[in-house]
Regions:
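C-terminal active-site "lid" helix and adjoining low-complexity regulatory extension at the edge
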Residues: 198, 212-216, 225-289
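Glycine-rich phosphate-binding loop of ATP-grasp-fold ATP-dependent ligases
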Residues: 71, 77-80, 110-135, 156-159
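Protein kinase-like catalytic core scaffold
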Residues: 110, 168-169, 219, 232-235
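Phosphate-binding site of ATP-dependent enzymes
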Residues: 124-206, 211
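Short acidic/polar capping segments at secondary-structure boundaries
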Residues: 8, 98-100, 115-119, 129-131, ...
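Conserved N-proximal alpha/beta basic substrate-recognition cap immediately N-terminal to
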Residues: 3-106
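A short linear hydrophobic-aromatic micro-motif
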Residues: 92-93, 109-112, 145-148, 218-221
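A short glycine-rich, hydrophobically flanked beta-strand micro-motif that places a catalytic Asp/Glu
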Residues: 149-150, 159, 216-228
């Protein structure tokens, strides 16, 4: 028995449909309803794996896909942004007032965000020192710190679902309003599936580089591309929405593969191989292993 563990108001449809499409027997459990199932959950000899869908609750099972610690790593946007900034995979970022003011004095427009955020909320575009100070005050009220980053004039944005170091699916974000800074699907727009042969390989390589900074087994990497083709990772989501039947099926195949073969990361070849070197072997017989 495989258990997909989710939080209230997060991943209901995604987990249900992925579970339905898996070949292994599975069930979806909401963490706030876990107590009354605890005995069944703890002692059922058929419980072989727990798949955490953005949920860090304690579970009585050692075989877990996405540990609580790994999820916490990427949920702490401030700490993970520092790590990505050191690896040069995100927009140039600033973590103190002095460096942010220096960037503004150089003529840069900045985006300021609190240390924890979601769905495009609490995003402030600043052009002046006064606007910066106002944004920092707003973020400080939330008690999670803040960071600033260069505003990137993007021409495309993707979500790359990475599992065990390989790509499960790629979707391009089509915004409701292209002028918005945050192309968040929760605020309008949609995800369009990208065919394997059309995968943006540079963006995928950068997404995997960011994923490799984590201890996640799987996650959805949000990445944008500017007019010069430069790629910048925004964040990694430990419970990326799966509204498309195609994407649900891809993730189900990946989970089934992990159950049979284990969750070890599959390294990438240094040779050129287009999409075949990046795709997970659960999805194509042409995948490089």
């Amino acid at each position: 028995m495989i258990t997909l563990l989710r939080r209230p108001k997060l991943g209901r449809t995604s987990c249900r449909e992925i579970s339905n499409k898996m070949s292994n027997t599975s069930m979806v459990v909401r963490n706030d309803r876990m107590e009354h199932r605890r005995e069944r959950f703890r002692y059922n000899p058929e419980t072989t794996m727990v798949i955490r869908w953005g949920c860090t609750s304690i579970v009585p099972c050692r075989n877990v896909l996405n540990t609580a610690r790994a999820i916490q790593e990427v949920n702490d946007k401030l700490s993970f942004r520092r790590r990505m900034n050191e690896a040069n995979v995100c927009p140039p970022s600033y973590f103190d007032t002095e460096s942010a003011i220096e960037a503004i004095n150089e003529g840069k427009t900045l985006v300021v965000r609190p240390g924890r955020h979601a769905q495009g909320r609490n995003l402030y575009v600043v052009h002046t020192q006064q606007e910066l100070n106002d944004a920092i005050i707003r973020c400080d009220r939330l008690g999670t710190g803040w960071y600033a980053a260069d505003l990137i004039h993007k021409v495309a944005e993707y979500r790359v679902f990475v599992g065990s170091g390989r790509v499960i699916w790629v979707a391009q974000k089509t915004p409701g309003n292209p002028e918005d800074v945050a192309w968040n699907v929760a605020r309008g727009g949609r995800f369009d599936n990208v065919r394997w042969g059309d995968w943006p390989l540079k963006a995928i390589k950068t997404a995997i580089a960011a994923y490799n900074l984590t201890t996640l087994d799987f996650g959805g990497v949000d990445i944008m591309v500017d007019a010069d083709g430069e790629c910048y990772v925004l964040e990694i989501n430990s419970a990326p929405s799966q509204t498309s039947p195609y994407r649900q099926e891809c993730v189900a195949k990946y989970f089934d593969y992990v159950i049979e073969h284990g969750k070890d990361r599959i390294p990438l070849s240094e040779e050129r191989g287009a999409w075949r070197k990046f795709i997970h072997p659960s999805l194509s017989e042409e995948a490089w292993e």
